Amino acid sequence: MATERRVARVAELIKREVSQLLMYEIRDERVGAGMVSVTDVEVSGDLQHAKIFVSIYSTEEVRRSTMAGLKAASGFVRRELGQRIRLRRTPEVVFIEDRSLERGSRVLALLNQIGQQQSTSEVLES
């Protein structure tokens, strides 16, 4: 079992390497169709499994297509990680769509809308 510090370092290294792979190495058109960014990586304590959370800025149809492309490219990503990172065993890679940024921007838009409505009602009351 790896220490928490080592797990965090490996997760950060995987995040950086997968980001590079997404930008320059993966040739699948489905992956390039939407703007894809790696938001987080969770690595198991034994360094055998890596959950890679990705944020995709595009339509729902393109998101599904991009996730299918990432799933198809997971073997390539694992092989490249094995060549770039020195680990006894290369972790299994799973891509998971992260919609937290989308939800956060929607909440901010709603808060801005509420703020505008309050300022408008204050002006009307004056």
Swiss-Prot record:
Give me the Gene Ontology terms describing cellular component: cytosol
List the cysteine pairs that form cystine. Answer: none
Q: What is its main location?
A: cytoplasm
Q: Which GO terms describe its molecular function?
A: ribosomal small subunit binding
Where does the secretion signal sit in this chain? none
The yes or no answer to whether the keyword Cytoplasm is present is: yes
Q: Which InterPro entries does the UniProt entry name for this protein? A: KH_dom-like_a/b, RbfA, RbfA_dom_sf, Ribosome-bd_factorA_CS
Q: Which Gene3D superfamilies match?
A: 3.30.300.20
Compartments where located: Cytoplasm
Per the record, the similarity remark reads: Belongs to the RbfA family.
- Record function comment: One of several proteins that assist in the late maturation steps of the functional core of the 30S ribosomal subunit. Associates with free 30S ribosomal subunits (but not with 30S subunits that are part of 70S ribosomes or polysomes). Required for efficient processing of 16S rRNA. May interact with the 5'-terminal helix region of 16S rRNA.
Protein name stated in the entry? Ribosome-binding factor A
